[in-house]
Amino acid sequence: SLVGSEMCIRDSGSKEEQKKLDWLRKRPYTLLFLDGAHENYDLLAQYPVEERFGGRVQALGGNVYHVCRGSVLELEGKKYLCFGGTESPDKEEREAGYNWWPQEMPSDEEYAACEANLEANGWQVDYVLTHDAPSRFLDFTSLAVGESNRLHLFLDKVLLKLTYEKWFFGCYHKDVALSTKSRCVFCDVIPMGERHAKR
């Protein structure tokens, strides 16, 4: 399973959240997730980075992995560009290091790593999984929430240069297809692979 939205390493790192993570670690399947707005990035940074599935991930125990930004994973013969991160619209109302982390926005190094990985793959993947979306997806839709930020503009640049089949993003907590190639996902489960590629 791939999750394109914040998932496990949440704000407080409480015992209840640890219990949920422990439950996920015991599932009989591999779970990969992208980071979003409300991860506790200080806790997440404590997990070691390793090469797996063709890209960089952090193993959280069991079969749970955080996918590092800009990784191109290879799963069941398909390539996935994965890029987490977003900008909280309410960050001024949050407390740094408690329920908001500046690391929610990608660093220069993460943008550069993404471009280098795409270059190494000839700017071609099967699927794109991001937490946020290019501004070109958001403009003129009900998903638009203010001014474009650096991440939106970076994803615009990727969108214009990249060859891909479908792009999925999860930041906006809605299930809506924007086109045959782009979709906002919140609760929907989207099957991937050969038999589902024509959907």
Which residues make up each language-model segment?
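Active-site-proximal loop/helix segment associated with metal-binding centers of metalloenzymes
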Residues: 55-56, 62, 71, 75-146
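Conserved acidic residues
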Residues: 6, 124-126, 165
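Short, small-residue-biased leader/transition segments that mark boundaries at the very start
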Residues: 2-9
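Structural motif
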Residues: 1, 127-131, 168
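A basic- and aromatic-enriched beta-loop-alpha substructure that forms the phosphate/nucleotide-
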Residues: 10-96
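Conserved beta-sheet core of the metallophosphoesterase superfamily
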Residues: 19-22, 30-34, 45, 49-62, ...
